[in-house]
Amino acid sequence: MEHPNVLVFVEFPDPTVPTTGFLKGFKYPDAEVVGFYHLDEGESAETVRDAHGSEFDSELEAIAERFEQEGVRAEYDLVFGQDRFAARRQIIERDAVDAVLLPGASNTLGKVLVATRNVGNAERKASLLDIVDQDELLAIDLVHVADPDDPEGESSGEGILKQTASTLVDVGFPELRIDRTVRTGSDVAFELSQAARGYDLMVLGETERDLGDRIFGPIGEYILDERDVPVLILR
């Protein structure tokens, strides 16, 4: 895929900014850096923009320049609202972005964990993952969370991971760098958070069931909050 468009969503007044070491692991996506400011009840966008607009714009420009310095074309924008999930969805749909990055504290991009729920759009997801520079990559591991009430959950998960790994190999990822793990649990967010320990990036895929807050809200946000691991959501 030529230059996929990645939405980088940061929140003001204290945005989490991707580190230079982390950005070195990306291979030529286009970045749309969007700063979101949460408006309190009765607070107007005009008042906040008048008071802090220049400061926030300067910060966003500096973040975009950090991407540019690593060879990533970047644009930036500042939005205001009371619902960051709704604002994010609106931008995603308006600009038809290919992926969403929620920045965290990782200083490198050597170990990537991919949550794999099913094999839907596997080839597209694999091609999107090609934005990760393989020269920097040490491991790209796969995890599936099986339903404990499903007697065939684990075996089904193993099949999903095997097929996903095969697709990654087909697009050029080294087979020796791919590990597969099936976890069992009813709390998917918790299981993925536990699995994300020690990784530099957590990758989630959007599925039909996951549209809206399930992925663009609580699960991705939960993992980021618990582990401070950047989350990349593939569409």
Which residues are covered by each model-predicted region?
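A short, acidic, amphipathic alpha-helical segment used as a generic capping/interface helix at domain edges
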Residues: T164-T167, T184-A196
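Charged helix-capping and loop-helix junction motifs
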Residues: G53, E158-K162, F216-G220
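Short, ordered loop/turn segments at secondary-structure junctions
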Residues: Y37-E41, V79-G81, G104-S106, H144-P148, ...
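Small/aliphatic-rich secondary-structure junction motif
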Residues: M1-T47, K111-S155, S166-P174, I178, ...
